[in-house]
């Protein structure tokens, strides 16, 4: 249902006011600290003789803009700690004047959703609320309900100026307990139509509940729409604990496990890379991989020694091999992506699709990126009866510390191309997805969160990095900091690197992310993650460095330290990144 929105002005509110000609603008501030429906405002400086138009909230960034092209942001994440409503944009028009000044009538530009959470009869009852997120889709495509916009303060007409977010989240740092029904309000663009799908997630300190519902109305501005979330009444309700284990429902549920890995096999011809494993080293590498029991493996730089690798991996089937590079003719682009995919015999991998990246940079002496057709591949892997997973494997552009301003935009463009493809398939197929490979990226030097993690969240999903979950306490490394090196990869660079306490806490460029579709009957949960150093050691050597910055096992950063350790040298120049998964099949 819907009802008209009321207005309650609070202490600290400010409005932008235009004069009769709608040319000059000034900031007016609320008088008094009371919360009230009718409030008085006073100008900062000389007041207008005929104030005529107004908008809320005032933003100094709009001071020099025309009344028809003001800008605003309805935030996708709305923090509820202070109880203040976010994104509550209004426009006002003078009604007349009297002894107390000019009277304005304000109209809300957007819609409000009254979210009432009742967790009684579910595991969430009595737990502390952390977040309520509402994602909106129409025919499986996200509906933008938050984002940047431009508006006209004369009449409240607005238009979106970015891609927007299909999800709005209310968040609490130390939220209330769900002992009884709780009501909160979220601002949304009035873009929701009758029949649109709401995918709702309620997260507490120890649980996460997911379910879906249909919109019964076309949202209009200046209206409140009720979202009565009595959780136990939703037949689509699924509840997980904080570790991702299924709590509800329990009937008709099947579970199982599988393991995947990603590895750069360093397979350039020895004429180009004399330090690579070569034929015999690749045989050893393949034999080691063959014995690990992984269910499927993504490899990159699978060029010259594919035959040796595939023969050694006798327990596996392989995807298309696209060839090597011609050592004697490096002026021509080789028709290969260097990618390889292996899956255990008895499983199936279908729908092989190859996509070349449109952005690229770097010739023979700058990463050799343009000598091949770098890109990504897409497979549908059936790991068990009824368990299909979309798997994406990739090898991205190299990074250059000599010219990062040229190389980083290309890498980000490739990441965004991959992200958009994955999101499109996710919406269409409603299957869980795994994205893995040599990204040549680090969270510390590339804006991976801004361009991959966050946009996927804004689309209503969650991209999870098991390494962040298991080895970084769920916190992404800070962008712009020094590289967090695993022990075996630390070479004493005190200017750019931090030596981590072991071979697990450090970051490598080989990534594995996974994304669940909330409406899928198959859900994935990472239950383990490791850089498999121990099984892929060629040799060891003693290492000692002085005056270095280290990170200890508790995450403390210590400067000017002396470290000594046994460095493990791999069979290739990368170690495998391995992730163990648990899958759950929910009969809905």
Q: For the regions a protein language model found, what residue spans apply to each?
A:
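Sec-type signal peptide cleavage vicinity
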Residues: 1-254
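Residues within well-ordered beta-strands of beta-sheet-rich folds
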Residues: 18, 53-55, 112-116, 259-261, ...
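N-terminal, active-site-proximal structural segment of metallo-dependent hydrolase catalytic domains
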Residues: 235-314, 331-336, 573, 580-588
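Active-site beta-strand/loop signature of hydrolases that rely on acidic residues for catalysis
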Residues: 259-265, 285-309, 342, 379, ...
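Structured beta-strand-rich core segments of catalytic domains in phosphoester-bond hydrolases
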Residues: 299-399
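Acidic/histidine-rich helix-loop elements
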Residues: 262-283, 361-370, 397-410
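Short catalytic/ligand-binding loop motif for oxyanion handling, primarily in non-cytosolic enzymes
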Residues: 268-271, 305-308, 330-340, 350, ...
